[in-house]
Amino acid sequence: MKSSRILILLIITIIISIKSKIPEDKNKLKEDEDLIDISTGYTHVNPSDRTYFYIALVGTNDIHGHFYPDQLEIGDYKYSQGGLDYLSKYINILRDEFPERVLFLDAGDLFKGSTESVLSDGEIMTESLNLMGCDGATFGAHEYDYSREFLEKKVSQAKFPYLASNIYDNKKKTKNAFGTNHIISKEYYFNVTNTYLYQDLIKKKLENVPDTIKIGVVGLSKEMKKSEIKGEGYDDISFLNYKNELTEEAKRLRDDGCIAVVLLAHIGITCGKENNMGLNMYTPKSAQDYCNSEDDLYQLVMSLDEGIIDGVIGGHNHQQVHHWVYDIPIISSADQGFYSSILYLPFKYATSKKIYEIYKSKIQIEGPLPICEKVFEKSKRCDYVKKSEIKNYLPLVNYKFHGVKVEKDDTLNSIHEKYDQLYDKYNEQICEITGTEELLKVSENGDFYLGNIVTDIQTRMTGANVSIFSHDILKTYWNPGKLPKYKIRDLITIKSNLCTFTMTGKEIKRMMGFLQTGEKKYYLTEGLKQTISRNERGEYYLSDLKLFDGYMETELMLEEKYTVSTIEYLIKEGGNDFKKILNWYTPTDLDCSYGDIGDLIEKYLKAQKIVDVRKYKDENNPKIQFID
C-alpha cells in the first residue's frame, strides 16, 4: 500500500512538474514571436528556390582580436556591441537555412588590437574561428606586426586555410610562405542533390546533371612596404602584383571547373556613408553611394578583365561596404566585429550547356548585420549613441534574424571556460570621461583627444620638454562615461616602456621635419606647435616649429638641449618611422625606467577619477596648423 501511494505521488509530481513547464514554453514561443525581426521589410533569398541554387558567403574583416563585446553604459542604460558569440549565432542561423551552403571567410587583421588577444597570445581568435567553422582567411596588415614565427604558429593551429597568392618567399622560391596550411587559393564543393532545383531537373529526365557546384576563392594579403612591417623574420618575403596573381589564380580555378571565383582580400575601399548603415537586401539595381576611385581595391577591380572574379570580401579600411563596382559586388565591414554582411551567389542550370552558371543579375548582399546582444527598437542597431539622444532610440529589445532569435550562441562555451576568469578583472572601472558626447576616436591629423591625453601623460610622468607618440599605435576608441580597464589596454596593445632622452633644438627640428612627412603621419606631440604647409608638388612639409605650453609659443633654440619622451618601441627599437631617425641620431641620456606606457596611463587616469577631455584640445589654438 505504501509503495502504491509513493507511485501515485510520483505520477502526480511528474504531471504537476510537466504542467508547470508548459506555460513557460508557450510564453517563450509567444515572446519569440513578438521580437522585432531586423530583416523584415525586404524579400529574403529563398533557400528552397526551385530555379536558383544559392550559396551564402559570410564575410568578416578587421576583428582586431575582439572576442568579447564592447560594454556600453550611457546614463542609466547598459548594453553591448559586437562579440563573437552573436556573430556565431548569425552564422548558425544561416547554416540551418542553407544546409552545407554557407562559406565563412575572414579578410584579415584578426589578432592585433584587444586585451583578450594579448592575454592569450592571439590563441583566443584562432580557437574561436576553429569552433565557428571558418572556411578560410587571409593575412591583414597588422598580422605583420607579429614575428613570422608567431604567424606560422597561428597558421598551423588553424583548422582552416590561410589564402594569399601574392606572398612570395624569395629564399624558398615559393608562394607557400608560412606553412602547409597556407595556400594561395582553394576550391569549395557544394552538394546540389538535396535541393528542389536538382530534383526538378532529374524529374525532367535530363542526363548528366552535375550534383555539385564548385567555386574558388583567391586570397590576397595587403601589400606591405619593408618600413611598414614591424615583426621579425620577413626579410625574405616580398609581395607580388595584385592583378597578375589574381588573374593567374582565377584562371587556374576556372580551368579546374570552378563556376564562380571570389576574391578574399585585405585591400581597402571606401564608399559614401549616407546609406551604408541600414540593414537591407541590396541588388545590382539598388541605389548606392559613390566609391572612392583612388582606393586600392577599387583600382584593382577596375583593372581586371571581364569574368575574372564574381565577388569580393574585402577589408583594411574599416568601412561598411555593400556596393557594386561596375558588376562586381563587394562586401566589407567596420572594425572590431561590430558588423558583418552576407553575399548570396545564385546558380542556375543551363540545359543547353549542361552546366550550372552564376547569374550576376540575381546576386544579392544582405547587410550590414548588427552584431548585438540587444538592439534599439527604432534603429535596429546597437551603436554608441549620445546620452542626450538615447531616449530617441529606446527601448533596447531582443531581436531575431530570418525569424530566429539572435542570442548568445553556445558554440564558444569552451572559450569562455578557458578565458573569462583571466579577462574579468579588465572590466574594472578606471575613470569617467566627461566634457563631450562624441566618441574619442583615433585620427591621422596629430591633434585629437585620445592622442593628446597620451602625450600629456607622457609629459607629466617624465617632466619632458617635448613628448612624441605615433597615432598608428593607438588601436581603439573611447566613449564618454565610465572607462573600463580593457579600453586602456585595447588602446595600446604593445608592451613598451616610456623613455626620455636628450636632443638639441636642431635635432628635434630635423626629427619632426621627417616624422611629419614620413609613412605614419601625423605624429602626436606635447610641447610643440607645428605649421604644416604644402609645396608646389602638393606635398605637405613642416614649415615652422616652436615650443608650445598650450597657451604661449616660444622659439626652439637650435643649440639648446631638451628632454624628449617617447616609448622604447620607437626610440630604441626603431619602430615605424624611427628606423630612419636612428640612422643619424644616437639617443643620449636614454632612460627607459619609467615603466610600461599602458600601466602609466591606467595609473594616472585612475588617480584622476574624472577626466574632462576639453582641457586636452583647444579648437581655437591647435597644436598643428595646416596651410595650403
Ranges and model annotations:
Residues 25-368, 373, 445, 449-457, ...:
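Acidic, metal/ion-coordinating pockets
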Residues 29-96, 196, 200, 228-243, ...:
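Catalytic centers of hydrolytic enzymes
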Residues 17-24:
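Bacterial Sec-dependent signal peptides at the C-terminal "C-region" and cleavage site
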Residues 4-17:
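Cleavable N-terminal signal peptides of Sec/SRP-targeted secreted and luminal proteins
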Residues 5-8, 297, 412, 578:
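Short amphipathic alpha-helical segments that mediate assembly, nucleic-acid/protein binding
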Residues 15, 115, 128, 473-478:
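Compositionally biased, low-hydrophobicity segments enriched in charged and small polar residues
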